Amino acid sequence: MKEKLTAAAYIAGWKVTSRLPKPLAKVLFEWGADVASKKGKGPEQLRRNLARVVGPENVTRDLVRRSMRSYMRYWREAFQLPAMAGRELAEELNRNFVPGSLELLHASAQSGRGTVIALPHAGNWDMAGVWLVHHYGTFTTVAERLKPESLFEAFVEYRESLGFKIIALTGSAVPPLEQMEEVLRGGGTVCLMGERDLTGRGVEVEFFGEKTSMPAGAALLAQRTGANLFTARVAFRGGSTDPSPARRGGPETWEHEVTPVAVEGQTLQQIVQEMADNFARGIAQDPQDWHLLQPLWFADLSQSRRQRLGLEEAPGEDA
C-alpha cells in the first residue's frame, strides 16, 4: 500500500509540475529543497558524501542547501522536460559542451563502432539524452525496475516519449547486457549511470581516497564490442546553485563534457578505476551538482550489506 501511495503521489506531482509556469515551479522546488536540506536521512548522507569530496570542514550549510536545490532542479526539469524538449533546447545544449567534446562524440558516431557513455548522478543527465536523441535519433539505457510496476511503467513511458530506449535491469527475456551489445554492434549509443553499484557485483575501486565498488557494465560492453567508451561530466550553470557567484542568479543552463577512456590492453579493473578517476575530477569541479543521497563507500554501508558483499564475516562465523 505504501508503494502504491508513493507512486500515486509521484505521478500526480509529475502531472501537476509539468503544467506549472517555470518561475512558479522554481520557487516551489527551491523552497522544498531548503526545507529538506535542514533535516532527514538523505541530506545527512549527502553531507557525508560531500565530506569526501571537499573535506568535512568545507561542507557548509550553503553547500548543502545548494546541493539540495540542484537535486530538486533535476526533478523539476525532469517533470517539465516534455514541454521543454525541442530543437531550441537541443541547440542550446549544443552550445554548452566544453570545447572538444562534441568533436569526440561525432567522431565516435561516424566510426560505426558504437558509443558507450557512463555518467554519474550529477546535474541533469536526461539533458544529455535529449541531445543524443536530437543528433542521433535515439540511444539505449538501462533502468532499475521500480516498485510498484505502475511507477516503472510511467517512468518508461515518459522517457520513451522523449526518444530514449529503455531496457529493464531485471525481468527481461534477453539479458540487458546482450541487448546493449546488439545496439553497439549496430553502431548505436548506450548511456549508463556509472558510480552506484546496485547489484553488488561491481568492481572495487578507490574513489576520493576510499574503497567502494562501481558497475562494470560500461567497461564490459566496450571490451566485448570494441565500442568507444567515454565518461561524462554533466553540470548545471546559472540559477541559484552555480559555484561561480558571478554566474549565480543568471539564466539556468547546463554544461557537458566527455572524456575518452582507454580500453585496449587494459584489465576490467583498470578501466573502471579510470572511469572512477574521471568521475571524481568532474564531481570535484561541481560538488553541489552530485546528487547522491545514498551510501556509496564501503565504510558507510550497513553491517548486513557489508556481510552480503563479503566485506566482513557474519556474527558467529570463524575468523
What function would you assign to each model-found segment?
Residues 56, 60-61, 65, 107-109, ...:
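Non-catalytic C-terminal accessory region of glycerolipid acyltransferases
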Residues 111-171, 200-203, 242:
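Catalytic core of membrane glycerolipid acyltransferases/transacylases, capturing the structured
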